[in-house]
């Protein structure tokens, strides 16, 4: 397994991708999910039905004193992060762009939208929830619950961005797209036994393992 070559791991991002697997003759193929983990801009690993391997690999890296763990709002992402341990070092950050995409789904005026966006961009989650409640913004109950659930993962995005720190999980999303370019070739179907090897080989290539 690749490691960070002596460099401390300061950031990781986790996301899911889809791969089409072969089924018995006469049955339609099925899309199944795999998990992909990107360590900074250096290394990546994707696993199919093997979250334990993903967590073991992350544990083998050289962790910095503080490691930012980025992800979207899906529960599975945070379950894996939590299982990695290192609670005293791991700082979970909700993808700021996904947060704003979810905000955009709430029915409200442009002025209300801007007000809540400003509060959230500054990490003022409690104030944002209060604003939505106080102004009786239509259909905001679900979003308020979403904010409460992820409150500890919503930092001051503006300050992080100004400091040059990541505020989104774009790196792992880019990884998933690069994997898709290989595994979603026109008409491609994979046996479940071969999927792990296909993903590992593709990540090894992207990690530069085959460079001369």
Task: Give the positions of each predicted feature.
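Catalytic center-proximal scaffold of phosphoryl-transfer enzymes
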Residues: 1-212
